[in-house]
């Protein structure tokens, strides 16, 4: 049976095995999908061992997306643009194809599942790590009026601005730099919610915002979404839909078929609430 896994640290919280099990049943594929904990200093070693034991492909999550980019021997165009990789497909001659499905997963969830049109909108993206860099190009391809990147370390946000400056109207800086501006959509791409923490976003930035989105998923509102709700935002969405949509893109890369996602999103929400009760 073909073996796949999601690799990260921490990893026990991951719902990727649940999602890919649903996809396999839906499409009639025989596959084993599990979690793989890698030491913070042992990503490449863990990947090599997994492959030597017959692994076919991997999903990569926090904090290894930049290391995965460096380890891949071939890259898809979207992974090359992102400088970050969240999917490996192992190929012949020890080749590793690296892809990044985060951006298309996010955009599909926002534009299709949530029916939120991005053209002309002002978007604030919080964070400048692997999760953020993976979604910038797909967001810009939707032609927003502005994509602003805010980060605790502004130099990293400015570096991303310079990396993607030819793809659309993009700017970068510290959170405080955007006080007084109004955004239609605010996206949290930091890992703060993973640690039950709140990014340093000024309350002022939520004024007039139509949709607030946390790329991490939870059985209840994340601290970021809870904070947004106290500022009067009512359209609050976590990353459950994005997780399923990006997983479907990985499944497509591995198996040549894109599974249906709507039912799986509903099943995953039920699963999250079941384990929270």
Swiss-Prot record:
The gene is aroE. Involved in the biosynthesis of the chorismate, which leads to the biosynthesis of aromatic amino acids. Catalyzes the reversible NADPH linked reduction of 3-dehydroshikimate (DHSA) to yield shikimate (SA). NADP(+) binds at residues 77, 127-131, 151-156, 215, 239. Keywords: Amino-acid biosynthesis, Aromatic amino acid biosynthesis, NADP, Oxidoreductase. It comes from Nitrosomonas eutropha (strain DSM 101675 / C91 / Nm57). One of its GO terms (biological process) is aromatic amino acid family biosynthetic process. Homodimer. The keyword Isomerase does not apply. This is Shikimate dehydrogenase (NADP(+)). Pathway: Metabolic intermediate biosynthesis; chorismate biosynthesis; chorismate from D-erythrose 4-phosphate and phosphoenolpyruvate: step 4/7. HAMAP family: Shikimate_DH_AroE (MF_00222). GO terms for molecular function: NADP binding; shikimate 3-dehydrogenase (NADP+) activity. The active site is at 65 (proton acceptor). NCBIfam families: aroE, PRK00258.1-2. GO terms for cellular component: cytosol. PANTHER family: BIFUNCTIONAL 3-DEHYDROQUINATE DEHYDRATASE_SHIKIMATE DEHYDROGENASE, CHLOROPLASTIC, SHIKIMATE DEHYDROGENASE. InterPro entries: Aminoacid_DH-like_N_sf, NAD(P)-bd_dom_sf, SDH_C, Shikimate_DH, Shikimate_DH-bd_N, Shikimate_DH_fam, Shikm_DH/Glu-tRNA_Rdtase. Belongs to the shikimate dehydrogenase family. It is an enzyme of class 1 (oxidoreductase). SUPFAM superfamilies: Aminoacid dehydrogenase-like, N-terminal domain, NAD(P)-binding Rossmann-fold domains. It catalyses: shikimate + NADP(+) = 3-dehydroshikimate + NADPH + H(+).
């Amino acid at each position: 049976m073909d073996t796949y896994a999601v690799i990260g640290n921490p990893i026990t919280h991951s719902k990727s095995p649940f999602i890919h099990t649903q996809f396999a049943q839906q499409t009639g594929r025989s596959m084993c999908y599990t979690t793989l904990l890698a030491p913070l200093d042992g990503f490449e070693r863990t990947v090599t061992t997994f492959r030597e034991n017959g692994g076919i492909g991997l999903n990569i999550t926090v904090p290894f997306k930049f290391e995965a980019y460096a380890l891949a021997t071939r890259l898809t165009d979207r992974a090359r643009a992102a400088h970050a990789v969240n999917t490996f497909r192992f190929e012949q001659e020890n080749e590793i194809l690296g892809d990044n499905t985060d951006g298309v997963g996010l955009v599909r969830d926002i534009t299709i599942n949530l029916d939120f049109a991005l053209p002309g909108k002002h978007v604030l993206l919080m964070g400048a790590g692997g999760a953020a860099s993976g979604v910038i190009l797909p967001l810009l391809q939707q032609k927003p009026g502005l994509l602003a990147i805010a980060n605790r370390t502004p130099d990293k946000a400015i570096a991303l601005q310079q990396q993607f400056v030819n793809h659309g109207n993009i700017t970068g800086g510290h959170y405080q730099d955007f006080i007084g501006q109004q955004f239609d959509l605010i996206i949290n791409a930091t890992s703060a919610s993973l640690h039950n923490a709140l990014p340093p976003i000024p309350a002022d930035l939520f004024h007039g915002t139509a949709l607030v989105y946390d790329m991490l998923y939870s059985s209840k509102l994340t601290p970021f979404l809870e904070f947004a709700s106290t500022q009067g935002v009512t359209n609050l969405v976590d990353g459950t839909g994005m997780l399923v949509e990006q997983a479907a893109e990985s499944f497509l890369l591995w198996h040549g078929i894109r599974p249906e996602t709507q039912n799986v999103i509903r099943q995953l929400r039920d699963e999250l609430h079941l384990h929270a009760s």
